[in-house]
A protein has these predicted regions:
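Conserved acetyl-CoA pyrophosphate-binding loop and the N-cap/start of the following alpha-helix
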Residues: 105, 109-117
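A short beta-loop-alpha structural element at the N-terminal edge
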Residues: 15-28
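Conserved GNAT acetyl-CoA-binding A-motif
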Residues: 115, 122-134, 144
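C-terminal "cap" of GNAT-fold acetyltransferases
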Residues: 158-197
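Glycine-rich phosphate/pyrophosphate-binding loop shared by adenosine-nucleotide-utilizing enzymes
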Residues: 14-16, 74-80, 168
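Helix-loop element at the rim of GNAT/NAT acetyltransferase active sites that forms part
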Residues: 26, 31-45
Length: 197
């Protein structure tokens, strides 16, 4: 993946840098996840407070499989977003998108800006459909994806388990990349997100 760095202005005028993740980001990424409130971490797929998990991610970093970007302010990571590519078979036109933003920077357009960057990469990779999976109790995440045009396609009963061992239904949401691109442009205009360079 070609290296890039973009500085954007959020809705409140805060300048934030968006760039691809690097192997050296392990400690900063771990600090980011450990600083998240437990409610925000409860529904993540792995124990992101575990140093070994983050180290494994950094060792296995491969942008042909997972496009991973971060948002940074004052050298601290404040957002993490990934696009998981299927690559082969009947799913090769699909990818899964995930995004986590520090609570302090939620509702300011940062999540939308991160997802827009990943959608741009999806277009480059000729991805036609994006999916997002979450637990049924993650209502705010569902609303966030609905705002950018994702639709709930399925709900699988007691399909996933949170980090406390409790079962939840898994919600699968889907969107066409072409429709999503237009929606992202509209949302960035709404949030008044400006790319500086």
């Amino acid at each position: 993946m070609e290296k890039f760095t973009k500085t954007i202005l959020l809705r409140d005028g805060t300048g934030v840098c968006i760039r691809p993740i690097e192997k050296e980001d392990g400690p900063a990424l771990l600090s980011f996840f450990r600083a998240l409130p437990e409610d925000d971490r409860l529904f993540l797929k792995e124990d992101v407070t575990n140093k070994d998990v983050i180290n494994r991610w950094m060792e296995e970093l491969n942008f042909d499989k997972v496009i991973a970007i971060v948002a940074e302010k004052d050298s601290a990571i404040i957002g993490d977003a990934t696009l998981h590519l299927s690559q082969r078979g009947w799913h090769k036109h699909m990818a899964e998108i995930r995004c986590v933003v520090s609570r302090e920077f939620q509702q300011k357009g940062l999540g939308t800006a991160l997802m827009r960057e990943l959608v741009a990469h999806a277009v480059e990779k000729r991805i036609l459909k994006l999916s997002a999976t979450m637990m049924d109790t993650q209502k705010s995440a569902q609303r966030a994806f609905e705002r950018i045009g994702f639709k709930k396609e399925a709900e699988l009963k007691d399909f996933v388990m949170d980090i406390n061992g409790k079962y939840h239904n898994m919600v699968i949401m889907v969107n066409d990349v072409s429709e999503l691109w237009k929606k992202m442009e509209d949302l960035l205009h709404y949030y008044d997100i400006r790319t500086m360079h």
